[in-house]
Regions:
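Short beta-alpha connecting loops at secondary-structure transitions
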Residues: 98, 105-108, 226, 390-393, ...
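N-terminal accessory segments
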Residues: 1-36, 66-68, 298-318, 411-416, ...
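FAD-binding subdomain of flavoenzyme oxidoreductases
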Residues: 99-254
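Short, ordered loop/turn segments at secondary-structure junctions
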Residues: 74-77, 137, 255-258, 421
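N-terminal flexible segment immediately upstream of the FAD-binding catalytic core
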Residues: 1-61, 77-108, 258-268, 315-342, ...
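C-terminal substrate-recognition/cap domain of FAD-linked oxidoreductases
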Residues: 22-32, 217-218, 224, 229-232, ...
Length: 434
């Protein structure tokens, strides 16, 4: 086997001196991510910062010739060890490739490099009245390249779908350094194999995306947001399922369980009831109140206590800000406990009440704090077990409970990961799922 520490060939690739580093601190930073627990990865021998497709191609070709492993790296915000090397080699940090190359309003398209932070896309589109809808909650800190690699999704997936539905074309560098163009800028095509979608969600295992053409859509003329309070978690999940199966045109529908509500109140100084809630947002070109009323009527049949629609945009923005930071708030909730990496199972809508009920039954049976919330409109739930970090047995049992939730989701016809990806954290579930 080749020596993964022999990266002397980098000096012959024409890279600038600041485009690669063997600094111990830099290498250590690229041996971890935001969520990996007890990482079994190996720090890369070198970190390379390409600034163009040509740089990526040169590095991959040379690494391939020398049998040196390369692990693509974006913002490092993944939760499952996706960008962490397992055999050392080179960490290919694409964050310097962060340009918006073109905005074509007439085509409803934008061309971007992979290192661009997601929220910067929508900021640039403001003046055109357009937006890119399928952003994850981490859009302010994660890159579009990482989102494409994970086939990311977020709160608006229930209406707008996942990233792969909005990627029109990709420029990809393969392991041998060859550059391929996949997809097209046409709205539709029946030409040949859909290789573009094979790359989306492949987590950097098949190639490195160096340019993406994304589809856009006009910003909705009408937006209404609010919250609904229910008599029980089961009532809330049943109401969500009923609304979705009835075809309610909702852009966001988020479950917040009582523990998550309590954490939100303490962290953000809000006065939300410590009760099961659903956060909602509707997008429409016209007649938005009709859809709000339809949703309210369905909720009324499923244990609705109160449904309040925000009168001012700032009021709802405050709730969405709290929801976006809820995972971090959970981590700060108890000084004596720490959270395990958040899970993100997704199940068919008809089983949503079942999986949330199962999570709550585990919490009750084992006297555990297991907050549960998530993008309920597409069957997704986020959860974590709070454990005593100083008690190895407690940590191990917490991980066992996390695994049980995944096993149950798979039994229900769901997936181990709705949006965080496989990485190293969920590899053991691949065989059972596929």
């Amino acid at each position: 086997m080749a020596d993964a520490t022999d990266i002397t060939f980098l000096a012959d690739l024409g890279l600038a001196s600041d485009q690669y580093s063997v600094d111990e601190t830099v290498r250590a930073e690229h041996a971890t991510d935001w969520g990996t627990d007890d990482a079994d990865g190996v720090a890369p021998t070198a970190v390379v910062y390409p600034e163009s497709t040509a740089d990526v191609a040169a590095v991959l070709e040379a690494a391939n010739d020398h049998a040196i492993p390369v692990t693509p790296y974006a913002a490092g915000t993944s939760l499952e060890g996706n960008p962490i090397p397992t055999r050392g080699g080179i960490s290919l940090d694409c964050t310097r490739m962060d340009a918006i190359e073109a905005i074509r309003p007439a085509d409803l398209q934008i061309d971007v490099e992979p290192g661009l932070i997601g929220s910067e896309i929508n900021a640039a589109l403001e003046e055109y009245g357009l937006f890119f809808p399928p952003m994850p909650q981490s859009a302010d800190i994660s890159t579009i390249g990482g989102m494409i690699a994970n086939d990311a999704s977020g709160a608006k997936t229930v209406k707008y779908g996942e990233i792969h539905e909005w990627v029109r074309a990709l420029e990809v560098v393969l392991a041998d350094g060859s550059v391929v163009e996949l997809g097209s800028k046409a709205k539709k095509s029946s030409s040949g194999y859909n290789l573009k979608d094979l790359i989306v969600g492949s987590e950097g295992t098949l190639g490195v995306v160096t340019r993406a053409t994304l589809e856009l859509t006009p910003k909705p003329a009408q937006i209404r947001g609010g919250r609904a309070v229910f008599e029980s978690v089961t009532a809330a999940t049943d109401a969500i399922s009923a609304a979705i199966t009835a075809g309610i045109d909702v852009a966001t529908i988020e479950l917040i369980d009582p523990l998550s509500a309590r954490i939100t109140n303490e962290e953000f100084d809000l006065d939300l009831p410590d009760a099961p809630m659903v956060f909602l947002e509707f997008h429409a070109a016209h007649s938005i109140e009709t859809e709000v009323d339809r949703c309210r009527a369905i909720f009324d049949d499923h244990g609705l206590l109160r449904m309040d629609m925000a009168s001012e945009p700032a009021e709802m923005e405050r709730l969405w800000e709290a929801r976006s930071d809820l995972a971090n708030a959970v981590g700060r909730y108890r000084e004596d406990l720490r959270m395990l990496t958040f899970g993100d199972v997704t199940v068919p809508m008809g089983e949503y009440s079942t999986i949330v009920g199962y999570i709550r039954s585990l919490a009750a049976e084992h006297d555990r704090l297991i907050p549960a919330f998530g993008h309920a409109g597409d069957g997704n739930v986020h959860y974590t077990v709070l454990v005593d970090p100083d008690d190895p047995d407690d940590v191990a049992f917490g991980k066992e409970l996390m695994d049980r939730i995944i096993d149950r989701a798979l039994e229900l016809g769901g997936t181990a990961t709705g949006e965080h990806g496989i990485g190293r954290g969920k590899r053991e579930f691949m065989t059972a799922e596929h």
